Amino acid sequence: MIETARVRIGNQTALSAYSVMQPFEYAVANGFDAFEWFPDKNESGAGWDENDISKEARLLIRDTATAHDIRLSVHAPWQLNPLRSETLEHLSKTIRFAQDTGASLVNVHLYADEGIAAFVDAIVPLKKRLAHDGIKLAIENTPNTGPEDFNKLFSLLRLTDNPPLVGMCLDIGHANLCKATRNDYLKFIDMLDPQVPVIHIHMHENYGDNDSHLPLFTGPAGKDPTGIRGLIERMKNRNFSGCIILEQWPHPESLLVEIRTRLLKIIG
């Protein structure tokens, strides 16, 4: 059974927030024990990237997180594909940001367009750099990657990854959009090999139509939370002990506290 103290719930930076720091400050003020930094600057200049946060600000983030027992993670920009050499310089910036802020995990998307074996080879330098600083690497499912991709990914990683340095970030909203499990993210989980280590969770909802990132309990689970209960039960069976990140900045922001309260009640 999950020990509540081992499961942390937090929020994430957001393009729609008033400032880069606003969601983090909200997490601190409201007692969240996890937080994720997601550099999301787009072509129009909206959002933020690693260059926008100074060395001094990074140290303040690290010290604040330590003082408030907040576990930090960093979500690499979605377009950073380890298979593409032109993205490696930016990926290094993301790693430095994680190191400077004391983050315990870096999250990247799984890109399977050149095959799973090619992706495994591509992340070798990344996982070695992170392991040097005790930082875990989480590989996230996208709407285009399914359970079988992750079963193959971790069967290959088990051949070279001992002790394990890499785990899965289970994105519930993306699992709900996966072609093989559309509108049935529990089926996605059930199709995962029991040996796939889920170490991080991204939590948001949709109706199977697009990646709308609805706050938890405002989409299908608002009418029937059975799916969320099933998710938590499955994570208990897997001895999940990582962070659950609420991937939205809702209005009002107090929805985040309400979501956390309901989740903790379900976790028990």
What residue spans do the PLM features occupy?
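Active-site beta-loop-alpha junctions enriched in small/polar residues
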Residues: Q12-S16, F38-N42, P77-Q79, Y111-D113, ...
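Hydrophobic residues within beta-strands of alpha/beta enzymes
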Residues: F35-E36, V106, L137, I201, ...
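Histidine-acidic metal/acid-base catalytic patches
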Residues: M1-R8, A17, M21-V28, S92-R96, ...
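Active-site acidic/histidine proton-transfer and metal-coordination neighborhood
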Residues: T64-H68, Q79-L170
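Catalytic-core regions built around general acid/base machinery
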Residues: D52-D69, A122-R129, L156, F188-M191, ...
